[in-house]
């Protein structure tokens, strides 16, 4: 909302006046939301705030919050330009796109990269250590520890490369994807270029790119979300297989675990060192994949020009990534 307002002020063919750098700073200061600020937004949505009646609408509550905060400033003459011609999904899909992009860049890709490098190190370190292979659970021709780790590292690398090349499609084209309000208000503006220019300004170096989707309904169809989530699901499946194989190597005493200082393996059998990290990882990856699978089946389908059922699903993205 804030960057959109600023971008409007910089466009020569739109009726907003130019904002000073100080005024742009006033808008951007709103991004550092305190707990009290968040409570104010929620109050506007649920029970009302001051003279504002409850909106029962989260994005509208954000709009009113911004207007309340900017009252009494030099921007008071521009308050009605906040949310101009936007539908809520124009705001939300950009916000989710940015959150997913940041999550990948700052958390997911570094974490997966660390796992990949650790397994690749094991592959190189133990490439000459012989290991009895098993097919159908029975003794088979020998292999090496390093080679079996290499199988997993090469699979992870392929998925990691695909994840690094991900793109997230986003939209900014109004209530039904047709720029209706935009074109009526300012027919002289090239709104397709406006959309592309605004979206691409978020593509800072190292970030998973946001790509403008110019042909949508009220919502972006989420196909690029599905591509991302299916990529994550494949990675998780590979890691589940890795956990299960390491579990078996530990069980067969090919691999020995070292207890942490003070660690208790069992409440009644103190000699045990259970492979709980691998087991917990397997369980958590399974939960994540159940969510990613549902996201992929649910999100690309929306009734006619949109229904709201995707909104509550999107609020669970963080659970799957956690």
How should each PLM-predicted stretch be described?
Residues 287-322:
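Long, amphipathic alpha-helical stalk/connector segments used for oligomerization, subunit docking
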Residues 1-182, 186-199, 265-266, 276-282:
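A helix-coil-helix interface module used to build multimeric assemblies
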Residues 186-289:
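Acidic, glycine-rich loop-and-beta core segments that form the ion-binding/anion-interacting portion
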Residues 6, 10, 248, 252, ...:
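Short, well-ordered loop/turn and helix-capping segments at boundaries between secondary-structure elements
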Residues 174-177, 259-264, 305, 309-312:
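A glycine-rich phosphate-binding loop feature that marks nucleotide/adenosyl-phosphate handling sites
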Residues 100-101, 108, 149, 221, ...:
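Amphipathic alpha-helical coiled-coil segments and their boundaries
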């Amino acid at each position: 909302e804030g960057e959109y307002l600023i971008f409007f002020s910089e466009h020569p063919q739109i009726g907003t006046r130019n904002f000073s750098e100080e005024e742009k700073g006033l808008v951007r200061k709103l991004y550092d939301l305190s707990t009290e600020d968040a409570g104010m937004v929620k109050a506007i949505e649920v029970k009302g705030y001051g003279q504002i009646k409850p909106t029962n609408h989260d994005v509208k509550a954000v709009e009113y919050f911004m207007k309340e905060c900017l009252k009494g400033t030099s921007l008071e003459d521009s308050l009605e330009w906040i949310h101009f011609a936007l539908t809520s999904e124009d705001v939300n899909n950009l916000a989710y796109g940015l959150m997913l992009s940041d999550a990948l860049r700052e958390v997911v890709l570094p974490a997966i990269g660390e796992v990949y490098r650790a397994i690749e190190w094991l592959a190189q370190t133990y490439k000459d250590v012989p290991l009895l292979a098993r097919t159908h659970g029975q003794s088979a021709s020998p292999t090496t520890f390093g080679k079996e780790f290499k199988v997993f590292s090469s699979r992870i690398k392929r998925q990691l490369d695909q994840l690094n090349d991900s793109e997230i499609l986003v939209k900014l084209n109004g209530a039904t994807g047709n720029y209706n309000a935009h074109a009526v208000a300012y027919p002289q503006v090239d709104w397709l270029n406006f959309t592309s220019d605004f979206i691409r300004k978020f593509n800072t170096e190292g970030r998973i790119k946001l790509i403008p989707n110019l042909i949508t309904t009220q919502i972006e169809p989420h196909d690029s979300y599905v591509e991302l989530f299916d990529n994550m699901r494949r990675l998780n499946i590979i890691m589940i297989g890795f956990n299960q194989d390491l579990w078996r190597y530990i069980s067969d005493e090919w691999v020995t675990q070292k207890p942490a200082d003070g660690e208790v393996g069992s409440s009644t059998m103190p000699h045990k060192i259970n492979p709980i990290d691998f087991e917990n990882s397997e369980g958590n990856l399974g939960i994540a994949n159940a969510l990613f699978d549902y996201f992929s089946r649910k999100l690309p389908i929306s009734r006619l020009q949109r229904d709201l059922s995707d909104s509550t699903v999107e609020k669970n993205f963080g659970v799957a990534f956690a």
